[in-house]
Amino acid sequence: MMNSTILDSKFIIDGVPMELSPRQILGGTQLSYFPESIIDESLDPSVGAYDLDGNKMGDYLSLVRACPSRKLLFPFAGEYARARVAFALLDALCSKGHFVLEDLNLSVNWHWTDKGVGSMAAFYKSVTGLADYAADLYLQIADYSLVEGEPAIEVKVALPEPGRALPSVLLPDPESWLIYVPFDTSEYRLGGSLLAQALGVEGGPAPKIEDTGYFGDCYEVVREFVEDGIAISACAVGDGGLMAALDLMCEAGVGLDADISDLCRAAGGADPVRVLFSEIPGALFQIRDSDFDYIDAELLLQDVMYFPLGHPRTDGSPLKIHSGGKTAIGSILESLMR
């Protein structure tokens, strides 16, 4: 059974005493005494073998849709915790009101239970990973709790106004563009993802999710697009990766021919399945064709990488993915010549 004194305990992980208790890391008031130390060891991820087929994108998407939620695997506890913060902030990106990233406060709820070797070390690493990531983004953890349950972390963001400022589905404007901005510079990896979970693979590396400076730059400029009305629809890229977000944006019956050729090249020739299902935090947003030059200039000014994926389809066509076609520059030139 879990109890709150775990937050006040000192930890010894892999034979090394940790300097701070979880509560001290989170900035809370420590008990006047330290309960008995918790001794545990880390678990390394196993080797993950993926047999991926680029012709089965639809099948993979169906598997991801069927997953109720992403499980927390102990070897990826730190990465999972950082991703929870990033995804919560991305969910807030399109909210009403005026705010910047540093205005936001976090509320964190840990569900945890002692599952033997590796579980308590994973808890400690999730606390340090989450707290360090939040601190590097200059965010306050306003409150936190620990309750008994299957290991998971819930992160909520306190917002100045309820509700979204713009829709999360594509608007039927065939001249408009859908833009993808990854908010982290990590490699596209499948470890710990919903797709890996659906395929029964628990090993392999996960995205690190560590580049908070780049995340902040991306958040600032895309948030300005939302507040200034440049973005006319938008969707966060989180659990399920880019593929799940694209699918969500097409839910209202507007289709999309998405070309990820440039994205795959920028990712070092990464496999399209990895690029589409790796859970790197990011955002998709739709802009009018007349605003393309403006967002291009703003993103270049902030040194933020972006990828034009294509135009919405209003002829009843579903979401289609292309990964070996012309570059986005070629698509832009073709659009200008129409």
Question: Where are the language model's segments positioned?
Answer:
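Glycine-/charge-enriched secondary-structure boundary and capping motifs
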Residues: 1-30, 113-153, 219, 225-338
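Glycine-rich phosphate/pyrophosphate-binding loop regions near the starts of catalytic domains
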Residues: 3-200
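Generic amphipathic alpha-helical segments used as scaffolds and interaction surfaces in large
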Residues: 72-76, 209, 233, 286
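Residues that cap or flank secondary-structure elements
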Residues: 80, 122, 213-214, 287
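Well-ordered alpha-helical segments embedded in enzymatic catalytic cores
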Residues: 80, 84-88, 217-221, 245
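A general structural motif
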Residues: 158-162, 209-219, 260-268
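A glycine- and small/hydrophobic-rich beta-loop-beta segment
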Residues: 196-228, 232
